[in-house]
Amino acid sequence: RIADYRLSPAEDKVLFRLDGKPLYRRSAYSSYVVYDTELGEAAPLHESDSLRYAVFSPDGERVAFVLRNNIYVKELATGRETAVTTDGVPNHIINGMPDWVYEEEWGLEDALRWSPDGEKLAFLRFDESGVRDYSLDLYGPDGSTPEDDVTAPRYPRRFTYKYPMAGEANSAVSLHVYDLASGRTTHVDVGPERDQYLPFFGWTPAGALCFYRINRLQNHLEVFVDDLKGTRKMIYEERSDKYIDNIGMGTVTFLSDGD
């Protein structure tokens, strides 16, 4: 059953996400299918049914997707796949997808952005190794049997995930840019502070990278634009003696000339 779909920019392809296994409030493990509207043909994006996210490149010729906490790029014409990251490990390193905090509290559904020219990928990397585990007992069907099946599990199952209590360590989050032509990944300088949030990032029309930085107390917000050539400029700053509301955060719009 189709859960969601995305059209390519030229609307000649459709990326279908099929029903999968829920993870958190907004995320799931799913299968994806690419449908070519001109040929009338459909093909799986990947053989796995555990993809976390997939998105067309700006020209519609590639798809970036996240599988097992790593990012891949697939050329649709040839089927060739390139690994953007290789260090992803469950409950340790997440690439291209938010951890629980960023999904639940900041509303991020993904952590991966194509550049306007389709030649670069910006992504967040979450190091959860310092975050303590939290476990819940889950009752009811686990998805392996129909809900009305008498053989469905009657005992609770244990679900364990990384959950930082108040005052405990959050994930260490870093921002990176992958260049498809060179295959090189660049670490973006977001400042020396470890205990902070990067709740929004994206590209300007001119190809510079914009990102928000806010401290853990959430009362000091800074917005930067980095041209990825050595120049970073703060374009907005806000302070509060209480806290800064995150409603509407990330709804920045750049003019077409990028200025």
Where are these regions (language model features)?
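Beta-propeller folds
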Residues: 1-259
